[in-house]
Amino acid sequence: TVLFVGGVTLAASSWIFGGVEMWSLHTLFAGSALTFLLSVCPLPKWFNGRDGEHGNRRNFFRLLKFPVFWLGLFLLLYIILQASNPAWELKRSDKGWWVEEVEHITWLPSSVEGEYEKMNAFRVLASFSMAFLLVWGLWVGIRRRRSALLLLWMLAISGTAMAMVGIIQKFSGADAVLWSIESANPNFWGSFYYRNQAVGYLVLILATTAVLYFYHYNRSEKTGQSGGPHLLL
């Protein structure tokens, strides 16, 4: 169950515009939250996977021993403090926009109070929460090597397909994201409105394919096989 939900969420991250659209951000957040909940919340036996390792006490303690859990929790709490203590307020008029200072607690982290649809601290909180919930859920919920490999292959295939679409868009002179959605930024790539987001994602895909390559290469060497899945990478 964790493998399916987490894998679909990872694969979908290649195609739903990097969370720039509101519906895509909330879709990724829902998938990440569900992955995490399926990993740590108690589940009935019939819904607990073949190995019965989901939603038990050992998973919860495994989460507490994961350094990224505490790092992410600290960062999310920091962002919550910022969001709850705005030092500047965004103002708009027909002539443009500006910021005005507002009363705030000076010794606490602060932020700019803006529109959630555009960008503010709460939207940043949603983005970081989405990422950490998915990482926590996969770390706790994926216990078998076969499941981990399948998850990595899903990510690699989806990301590679997105990269190929980006290349085709570039050479075909596409003027819209995925040939259908207009973007205020003309320098989009694949399904990403901004190239810096695409680069970050493609670096993740490159690292994933490298891990898969060396894993399958070493396995082929140990078993004396002349080929293997690594040749596809």
Regions found by a protein language model. Name each.
Residues L155-G166:
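Hydrophobic alpha-helical segments characteristic of transmembrane helices
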Residues M162, D175-F214:
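Membrane-interface segments at transmembrane-helix junctions in multi-pass inner-membrane proteins
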Residues T1-I157, L178, T209-L233:
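Transmembrane signal-anchor hairpin modules in multi-pass inner-membrane enzymes, especially those
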Residues S172:
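Conserved donor-binding loop and adjoining core beta-sheet/short helix segment
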